[in-house]
Amino acid sequence: MSETILEVHHLGKSFGSHEILRDIDFVVRPGDVTCIIGPSGSGKSTLLRCMNLLEVPSSGEIRYHDADIMDKQMNVPEYRSRVGMVFQSFNLFNNMTVLKNCTVGQEKVLKKSKEEAEKNAMMYLEKVGMAPYINAKPKQLSGGQKQRVAIARALAMEPEILLFDEPTSALDPQMVGEVLEVMRKLAKDGLTTVSYTHLTLP
């Protein structure tokens, strides 16, 4: 059996008296493409946010290469660079160009030089078909283009796992296909992913 990257054990999450997650268990291994399926309001997004430490679990544990991610010794920014996340609402910096959106995290968190960060960003922007738009601002892009930039930004941090939090929910139907195509290519390339989406990847 191959080494696990992430292990979720007996995970629970409550907001006040409202229980969202109860006793969740699963493991993620290199190359896995994991899809979280369930009705609206069942806690799928909350689960991904717990895995990225945007929410702190109420009980249970999440282990990354056997290290407890809730341990006080855990370097959270570094962990988040290894377990990246693509959000429903893109979360791009509207005052920055496409290229800058994809380099700022590398420079701040990974301490890469501007030149190295730009070279790396360009590689991933080309991968998602957004290299021609490096000088554009997010407001000049379609929803599908914004999400492809968000994916490139996450990839530029060179994550071991990429979490997709309903990446197509904010898109017009005609834009969904281009984002799903990028996700299919990433899966074929062997990137480990965990996705919450109402759509399947044929």
Task: Report each predicted region and the residues it spans.
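ABC family nucleotide-binding domain
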Residues: 3-199
